[in-house]
Amino acid sequence: MRTLVESNNVSFAYQNSTEPALQDISLRIRPGECVLFCGRSGCGKTTFSRLLNGLAPMFYPGELTGSCTVSGLLAGSAAIEQYVPLVGSVFQNPKTQYFNVDTTAELAFPCENSGMPPTAIRQRVQEVVAQFHLEALMDRSVFKISGGEKQRVAFAAACMLGPKLLVLDEPTSNLDAGAIRQLHDMIAAMKQVGMTIVLAEHRLAWVQDVVDRYFFFEAGQLTAVWTAADFAALPETTLQNAGLRARDLTACREKLRQKTTMQCTGVPILEVQNLTLGYHRRSLIRALPDMSFAAGEIVGLMGHNGIGKSTLAKTLCGLMEPLGGQILWEGKTANARTRLHKSFLVMQDVNYQLFSDSVREEILLGAAHPKLVDTVMQALGLNGLADRHPMSLSGGQKQRVVVAAAMLSDKPLILLDEPTSGLDRGNMEQVRRLLQQLKTQGKTIVVITHDEELAADWCDRIIALQD
């Protein structure tokens, strides 16, 4: 039987790391298959995907043993440029793979790098735009399109050279339901024309109908392989024990419907009145409805990509001033300095918040109760990472480091912007338990998210922002 990807006894340890990221991985992926790598945060999914697109060990140096080939290219021997026409990659954060500030130029870029004639480039751009229905996104600034739109353009750019393999690393972590459906349709279209697709993903419900096999990673090892039918038949307890997310969101969506309301039932501690958001007067983003937040509640803030959720979060915590309206804290107008003093924001991209040389030092920065650092690290599964450099961690581990810092800050207002990107089911439960503790201490917690599973499970009520 033909294989496109073949791995034999692969082990890999990142440079300066004492623990292997992968241990003795052997697998085969056939042409035209769609497979999904699943497992807990830090289990090795992303590392193995980096072997498939040539980023490891060339860009991410480390010690590689065994063999991993993609269409005959041997990881560790083949140069990165040899992978370019064969493997297309889509990352969790599309901003990290953009080379141009214009969407049309971004699509043309792979073809230009490959020496394609200008007329052929224009024709190929037109073909891909038509294939993925991107006409409305062409000739746009990449700074003025939503996260979901950026991901669609990144996906199309990855397909420009007609690769044999597409590798997608948590592509839905920052996408709303509509953008996820669009990405799903793009993946299904590529599978239909025979492209091989590898997904490394925590969120499982959106892609079940296109996945052929599931590869379960655990602590750097491949411990299970399921066909789609076998995976669908797994008991829910098996998924929970494995740290895997839900396969069906029907119950979550009903809970969300019941929890959606603008106003709190308790005494409001934070109030938003007649608020207008924007980066400057010529770039009006949103006129918001009035809303209020009480002490001791967890509120989910939901809405489609680009509606202004992250901008509202930055405004509430004092990083931005509104263009109009007012924000009240305990009934008094709260300026930016007051809001900064009262709040802690866990950003969507936590790399902006990591400054120290070790995980322990990072969590202790600004800690109001440093004696609790070991307790919080234990609760978030970070105790074994205390001396690691934060930038050497996986995306989910970095997220938990900043969440731990928020827990210890003792701020009365905690805002989390897409806190589940990179988090498995077990990590989600760990964070949920800590947020419940903060809730009992009277903290106000605002969670900005597209994650229906998280919102239904964590939040007391939901504020749904709409056009």
What name fits each language-model region?
Residues T119-L137, P370-L385:
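Conserved ABC ATPase "signature" region
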Residues C159, A406-M407:
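ABC ATPase C-loop
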